[in-house]
């Protein structure tokens, strides 16, 4: 299995999985994808169903990873997934249970049973194990430079804290996270964790990460890697839970006609991009529903064909803050597939048109015309009032308390349900404890606090303020990161 950049030219070399694991962004500014997607046949899915039932989620995940990873021994891969997906790190032994939402014709895939109560744990726990394994094998070290709108940061830091050969520099938008999210990150005082509050919004943080990655000399000197969803291994981990979701919703003997559709609360397009990849592999997913909040860049594209990232000033602060993103970094992967995997055409859009015009328009193309039939995508939006109403309604009618992002998903799911046949699953993003103020506003009461989080907002915190400057960030890395630690 070899990997290619979305901006590849005719002479761009392919890479191995272990190389791109540590590298993150490709040297040409593109994102890595497999040269070809492996396929999942009906018999493959039957075998994975047996493995999931008899051996558990970790063993099933190892089976899927083995389709993409041929430079890590199969026995080692099984051990890696067994360490990543275990209790008590995950509070439910099923890791990803799927339940019917009472009183509706919807299902919920529960992705937030990990150590930080967010779906990001599903990828980060695996990424931490993969990083440590590969760095130990190479005798190397890595400086992770990442950006978070709320959940990625804490998930990454909990997965990477105290790991050999790893330092973490995590950028957050100052004042844009909930008190719980800030406490989860800033109360980690481990010597290999550096929390940074940037004077800007999430997209500014993400741009700083890209600027660091595009400085080849600095990146090489400081061994810079990525945990944001620009890292292919993140998406690969997420592909696994879409397979598990399909297996848990369908019955024994299900075949390619047994379509399951999913609704994915979306900001950076990573989660739903994993659904797209699983669908390309042959997993019988029907419609892929992109649910956005008021920062509706993705919804605009799927409705109109125009991709128009917003400026920092135009990115709204909402009550589903982890989706307050107006430059979807993973979107390039999908556009690469949409354009027939043409690296030159993809580069022309993302490196040239966006820089020159601030948008690109595919509305008149045959690719956009066939978007739903070929790739299954539709979209919808949700507002503050919508998510408050959905949180209150779902608690009253179903006895289930949603976090604001999952509420966006359920709101959109109800709106599109008449268009979709067969099971429809909303992919949960987090537990409501992370968004207490919004839950209180919606329901009149605070969310329950799991025992492991009691008192977290009263702990000592450490964070470094930073101007929105790549040079200032480089100076901070030089000052705070211990090479080889």
What is each of the regions a protein language model found here?
Residues 1-485:
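PLP-dependent amino-acid enzyme catalytic core
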